């Protein structure tokens, strides 16, 4: 089904930098419709439950960071004490909880033709250093994996976007009751 819904979260750095309106306008200009939106101060428990703890998710998150470190010539053992993708994923998840609870976030549901795919394209790659100009992370991110490693934290990359239609469904149900999502 080409018309679908997806979840987008504007992370604390996007909110703190006053980029909410600018980022939202990108999606509206791309033909996506906002069907739910709220600003929340998430608790550590909510973020802990929101991001998966499966070995598959931890490994995937860890591999993304290890790839970024490799591209930047960073030794993961020296910076974070391990090069095991699952353990790196655990470190990322702990840092994500701290980051995502450091300030308010804006959570929204976008609807449109191939919404998941379009949002992912507009957002750009997870790591800002490899996000091309024209993407949200490429145009607005001011962080990088090497700076984040130096400061012992996760990369501030402005937004979270669902990876797949099935993930979007789970994530939308997590943040919104059915009656909060308009058609």
Swiss-Prot record:
Q: Which InterPro entries match?
A: NDK-like_dom (IPR034907), NDK-like_dom_sf (IPR036850), Nucleoside_diP_kinase_AS (IPR023005)
Subcellular localization, per the record? Answer: Cytoplasm
Q: Does the keyword Protein transport apply?
A: no
Q: Which cofactor does it need?
A: Mg(2+)
> Signal peptide location in the record?
none
Q: Name one Pfam family in it.
A: NDK
- Disulphide bridges in this chain? none
Tell me where on the tree of life, at the top rank, the source sits: Archaea
Q: Per its database record, what is this protein's job? A: Major role in the synthesis of nucleoside triphosphates other than ATP. The ATP gamma phosphate is transferred to the NDP beta phosphate via a ping-pong mechanism, using a phosphorylated active-site intermediate.
Enzymatic reactions: a 2'-deoxyribonucleoside 5'-diphosphate + ATP = a 2'-deoxyribonucleoside 5'-triphosphate + ADP; a ribonucleoside 5'-diphosphate + ATP = a ribonucleoside 5'-triphosphate + ADP
Q: Which residues cross the membrane?
A: none
Q: Write down the species.
A: Pyrobaculum aerophilum (strain ATCC 51768 / DSM 7523 / JCM 9630 / CIP 104966 / NBRC 100827 / IM2)
- Molecular function in Gene Ontology: ATP binding; metal ion binding; nucleoside diphosphate kinase activity
Q: CDD domains, alphabetically? A: NDPk_I (cd04413)
Which residues of this UniProt protein bind ATP? 11, 120, 126, 137, 157
Q: Which residues form the active site?
A: 160
For this protein, what is the EC number? 2.7.4.6
Name of the top EC class for this enzyme: transferase
Give the region (Insert) as residue ranges.
Answer: 56-88
| Name listed for the protein in its UniProt record | Nucleoside diphosphate kinase
Family membership: Belongs to the NDK family.
Q: Which residues form a coiled coil?
A: none
């Amino acid at each position: 089904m080409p018309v679908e819904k997806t979840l987008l979260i504007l992370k604390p750095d996007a909110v703190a930098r006053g980029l909410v309106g600018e980022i939202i306008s990108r999606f509206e200009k791309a033909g996506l419709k906002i069907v739910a939106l709220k600003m929340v101060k998430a608790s550590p428990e909510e973020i802990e439950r929101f991001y998966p703890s499966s070995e598959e998710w931890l490994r995937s998150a860890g591999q993304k960071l290890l790839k970024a470190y490799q591209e930047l010539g960073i030794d993961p053992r020296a910076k974070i004490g391990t090069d095991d993708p699952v353990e790196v994923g655990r470190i990322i998840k702990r840092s994500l909880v701290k980051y995502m609870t450091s300030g308010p976030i804006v959570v929204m549901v976008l609807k449109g033709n191939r919404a998941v795919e379009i949002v992912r394209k507009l957002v750009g790659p997870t790591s800002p250093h490899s996000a091309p100009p024209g993407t949200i992370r490429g145009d607005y991110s001011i962080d990088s994996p090497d700076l984040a490693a130096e400061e012992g934290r996760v990369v501030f990359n402005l937004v979270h976007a669902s990876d797949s239609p099935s993930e979007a469904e789970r994530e939308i149900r997590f943040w919104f009751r059915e009656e909060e999502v308009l058609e």
